[in-house]
Amino acid sequence: MGQGVGLLFLLMKKLFTILFAALSATTSLHAQTTTPAWQKFVNNADDNVLLDFSYAGYHHGTEQPVDERDVYVLAKKLGYTVYNVCDHGAIPNDGISDRAAFEKIIEKICGRNKTTGKLNAKPEAKAIIYFPEGEYILHSKDDNTTNAETRKVTSNTLNLVMGYVIIKGAGRDKTFIKMEDPMQPTNPNIMYSSPKMISIRHNGGGDNNILAKVTGSAKKGDMSIEVDYASKINVGDWVKLFLLSKDKNAIKEELYPYDVQASMSNINGSGEKEGVNVVDRHQIKAIEGNRVIFEEPIMHAVNPAYGWDIRTYAHYEEVGVEDLTFKGKAKDNFHHHAGWEDDGAYKPLDFMRQVNSWVRRVDFVSISECMTFSECANCFLLDSEISGNRGHSSVRMQYSARGFIGKVWDHSNGYLNDDKNFTEYKENLGQYHACGISKQSIGNVIWQCHWGDDSCFESHATQPRASLFDQCCGGFMQFRMGGDINQLPNHLDDLTMWNFNCLATNPNDPVPFNWWVKNTWNGWYKTLPPTLVGFHGKNVSFKEDEMKLNENQGKEVLPGSLYEAQLTRRLGSTPQWLIDAKNITTGIESVKTIENTNNTDNKTYDLNGMPVGKNYKGVVVKKGKKMLNGVI
């Protein structure tokens, strides 16, 4: 068989496998036609408990960035310059570090300050850093520096202080960026202190300056706020709606219906950065007098008496990483908090203060912490596989607003944390913390992610709020959400889980599941009453009096995806990017189909039970039968 014919055969075989898996996906025959929680949201009922999460994602969920697999076609469309690492000294597959070539490109893009000699920031780099097919090493022990006096070894981050830049490979099955050796910790006693290998960032100059004092109140879902003077605010600006308050009433309201506990110094301490801290990043849509109108709904009620204000948000935009795989060497015998090599030695990438930026079609193999979006807004990660040796964490939105994490398949392997002697190697445990959120995050969506059997969604304390876990599946381990005792609660108001499919539990976990463990100094899980709709799979007994809503437990509900339903309702139709995303086959075995068995009309429905138009391409349900519509 010729090479071309063989390749065609493999592609057709893969396509057939994908289509067969999708068409034979399990259909839930007992699904509700429409769950009451959705009806109350649509009708804006007095007892509605759902926030509008549809503004999460790139350009508020309306579209995706320009997508071309051919780097030169992409560059032409965008008006960018391509910097091929091989043209600057990188040699793939030679086992030698290619860091110097990458540094040459950064310097060529940014230039240096003639006075200080430091690299310049580049807000609009308009550059694509391209890694052709092959394996490239961007960190090895040879890249470390050693202090001549103390002999301390330091690993240094590759900082890209720029916007409008894309790091692109030839495909995640073709381009591999490798961490050959661990990133050394700044302090071995601080287990998370190893730096990232690559950080694409704004360094924060001009951030957090007060622009106006908030004078009016607002409810969750409102789109505007009254301020004292709006003269420093402009249409199109990105700003922070900000609160830091030690007011005892504010703390009491924030923790209601629970009381503050002595261990909670983050929310109840006297330090400069302690107290109730809300950071809701917004783009300015319009200004009418001293009323500031946002593009997005406010996700936290505003009481001006507590000292709310509008602040600057320093950031860059349009940063992307796509079509490659990061490879590390996470320990074969990972144990949580066993040491710095376990918790953070291999952290390939983070974004810091980026807006409308993305990671797509990027895989992670044997990584400690896969990807962190920190102080970002409306960024996304879509279509990612996590495999190899398990590590500390997956993908998180940290101190970020309206991010979107979708279609992550996390099935890394290793040992249970209770297996102190490493006697039984297990597959599909997943990262210790699965996809999720951390710190003062708000409005983020984790969508159709599938994580391992010994994991749970991450909710890493320090005041995250208003998070949606939508159509996700995987383990549901108690006490796995993360966060130090002084940073609790793990999650404040408006934790929402929609159609979660529980695939594994720990038989040794307490029953019933506690959302607010009463023990003050050893209560490692505390979240305000959550909203669960359509929680199904393995049975979990919940304490109902610790929940805001537990609707239709044991059943999948319609709409299948809350994010999709809200976005479709807002825009009038489902955007093409989300239609395409639903057909992504990473982790295809986890696909669930919900059939609206009451529909006897001739309408065509997608796999979430939502009506779609005649131009929809993919697997659909019509008159109770699954079929292909159009061509994938």
Residues of each region from the PLM?
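Extracellular "leader-to-stem" segments immediately downstream of a signal peptide or signal-anchor
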Residues: 4, 14-15, 30-337, 527-586
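Sec-dependent N-terminal signal peptides
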Residues: 15-24
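Residue-level detector of functionally pivotal "anchor" positions at catalytic/ligand-binding pockets or at interdomain
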Residues: 584-608
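C-terminal tail/sorting-segment detector
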Residues: 619-632
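Right-handed parallel beta-helix
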Residues: 86, 164, 173, 237, 245-277, 281, 285-286, 317-328, ...
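Extracellular beta-strand/beta-solenoid scaffold signature
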Residues: 102, 145-157, 183-206, 302-312, ...
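Catalytic domains of carbohydrate-active enzymes that cleave complex glycans
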Residues: 449, 454, 465, 470-585
